[in-house]
């Protein structure tokens, strides 16, 4: 099976679907690879590097007529016509937003997989190009903001005076938002972030940011792993929060997107006007309509109030080498999934939830939209235990006279024992008493669930007792011999029981369950 990697023709696209490193991995799966000449130049991957990796350098027609075509941007109608019958195209397709492209693909007897339709489940994380590109975009958004911002991000105290740190507000704490939070925080800025999902507050704090919540936050995840649509009441309360925050910050980075829908409007025109001159807004959702009023895709707009609104839609492509490597790795992981035998033979299994969710067209048949894939929710917290209807009565404190009598009697007995006992016995009794105290506090604090493995650990202690008792079996005193025999018997029971418990514990981790003793 031949894999084709054509050059991207979309204006401004700098990424490539395979790098020399990922080409080696594809060859290791049993495929042949042809790369269009010049496909990786913008990503610092010349033709010679692909040739050294084992790929064949060919023309656009050779790449597009391969059995499996790997592409980054949505193909044009002319490129779709180049596909041979029965070919498989893997690319970003935006099927929910571009039904015309779906119809164009269905007019050909080809199969098309959308890399931007990977479900948000743990098994598909290695294929998720949206997360990979969002991570790069969040990082690059901060870099673009720093370039347009006229001051330091970090605060400084210099001989020329004190420089306050920049204040950054990140709207949306998804993959892109978290990347922006971490980058801005590492540059020394004071970072605030908000999201419709209150549970992300801990993630924001872990990256050095401060969570700014909307009063009476609502959880809106839509069951897909992405943020969902919010209510009108929530939007009004969020607008008040944004209006307060943007007046106080220097940089705003918006990342809010809803799959299959236009981007929600978060920052209104009057909010932009309230910001200080020199402030910067990066609208990462400009391609889907924008989160900010006045943002223009692929342009930097400066308002009359001196606020710069950056609407770049190619933020991942502004780091072409890194973006191509991550995109290519996601594609390699998909090809691994489609090649279960690793023999260079492509197998599309529509019973697999990941492959089914990505399949837009199969042999000219439209399979979009796929069945919904629900993300597993976190288990609910167990209900709190109800207090007992009749709490047990508190114990009466011991009588001081009784306590004094017990302590005094014990002291007298201890004095008599030490006065009339040999020094060797006193030393042994002291060690014995200390062992009782230490053992009580150590074993007494062990949780009940750990008592079984504790029996396994005590084999060594019981073994020492057995050895000591065996040394006393030949004593001249009959009493010592009897006590030694009893000690060997009791300690041996503990040893044998400990080994039995250990064997059953280890058997729990075996494929067949607990190990059974053979008859």
Language-model segments: which ranges?
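Phosphate-binding loop/pocket of nucleotide- and phosphate-handling active sites
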Residues: 347-418, 519
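Small-residue-rich segments of transmembrane alpha-helices in multi-pass membrane proteins
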Residues: 460-470
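Structural signature of hydrophobic alpha-helical transmembrane segments
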Residues: 60, 422-435, 456
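A structured beta-alpha segment of the ubiquitous adenosine-cofactor-binding alpha/beta core
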Residues: 54-64, 74-75, 222-251, 256-269
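Adenosine-phosphate binding glycine-rich loop
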Residues: 116-118, 122-160, 165, 286, ...
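Glycine-rich phosphate/diphosphate-binding loop of Rossmann-like nucleotide-binding domains
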Residues: 6-45, 155-245, 395, 416-418
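ADP-ribose/adenylate-binding Rossmann-like module
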Residues: 83-116, 251-310
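Structural/interface elements that position substrates and couple domains in central-metabolism enzymes
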Residues: 2-107, 114-144, 148-164, 178, ...
């Amino acid at each position: 099976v031949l894999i084709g990697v054509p050059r991207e023709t979309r204006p401004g696209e700098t990424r490539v679907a395979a790098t020399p490193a990922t080409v080696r991995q594809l060859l290791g799966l049993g495929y042949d690879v042809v790369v269009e000449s010049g496909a990786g130049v913008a990503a610092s991957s010349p033709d010679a590097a692909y040739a050294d990796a084992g790929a064949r350098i060919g023309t656009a027609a050779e790449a597009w007529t391969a059995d499996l075509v790997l592409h980054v941007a949505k193909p044009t109608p002319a490129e779709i016509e180049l596909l041979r019958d029965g070919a498989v195209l893997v690319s970003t397709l935006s099927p929910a937003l571009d039904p015309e492209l779906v119809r164009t693909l269905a007019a050909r007897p080809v199969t098309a997989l959308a890399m931007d339709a990977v479900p948000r489940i743990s098994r598909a994380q290695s294929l998720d190009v949206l997360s990979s590109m969002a991570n790069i975009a969040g990082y690059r958004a901060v870099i673009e903001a720093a370039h347009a911002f006229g001051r330091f991000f970090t605060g400084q105290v210099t001989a020329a005076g004190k420089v306050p740190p920049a204040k950054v507000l990140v709207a949306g704490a998804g993959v892109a938002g978290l990347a922006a939070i971490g980058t801005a925080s590492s540059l020394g800025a004071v970072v605030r972030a908000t999201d419709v999902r209150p549970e992300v507050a801990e993630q924001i704090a872990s990256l050095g940011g401060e969570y700014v919540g909307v009063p009476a936050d609502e959880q809106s995840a839509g069951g897909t792993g992405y943020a969902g649509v919010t209510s009108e009441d929530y939007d009004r309360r969020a607008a008040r929060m944004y209006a307060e925050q943007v007046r106080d910050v220097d940089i705003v980075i918006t990342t809010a997107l809803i799959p299959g829908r236009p981007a929600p409007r978060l920052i209104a025109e009057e909010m932009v006007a309230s910001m200080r001159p020199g402030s910067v807004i990066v609208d990462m959702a400009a391609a889907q309509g924008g989160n900010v009023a006045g943002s223009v895709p692929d342009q930097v707009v400066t308002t009359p109030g001196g606020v710069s609104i950056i609407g770049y839609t190619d933020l991942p492509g502004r780091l072409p080498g890194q973006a191509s490597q991550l995109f290519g790795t996601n594609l390699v992981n998909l090809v691994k999934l489609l090649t279960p035998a690793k023999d260079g033979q492509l197998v599309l299994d529509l019973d697999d939830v990941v492959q089914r969710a990505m399949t837009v067209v199969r042999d000219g048949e439209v399979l979009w939209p796929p069945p919904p894939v629900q993300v597993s929710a976190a288990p609910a917290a167990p209900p709190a235990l109800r207090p007992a209807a009749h709490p047990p009565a508190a114990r009466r404190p011991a009588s001081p006279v009784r306590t004094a009598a017990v302590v005094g009697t014990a002291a007298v007995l201890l004095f008599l024992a030490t006065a009339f006992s040999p020094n060797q016995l006193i030393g042994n009794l002291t060690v014995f008493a200390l062992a009782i105290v230490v053992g009580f506090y150590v074993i007494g604090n062990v949780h009940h669930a750990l008592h079984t493995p504790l029996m396994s650990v005590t084999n060594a202690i019981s073994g020492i007792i057995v050895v000591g008792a065996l040394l006393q079996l030949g004593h001249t005193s009959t009493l010592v011999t009897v006590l030694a025999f009893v000690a060997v018997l009791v300690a041996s029971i503990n040893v044998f029981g400990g080994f039995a418990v250990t064997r059953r514990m280890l058997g729990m981790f075996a494929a067949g369950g607990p190990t059974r003793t053979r008859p």
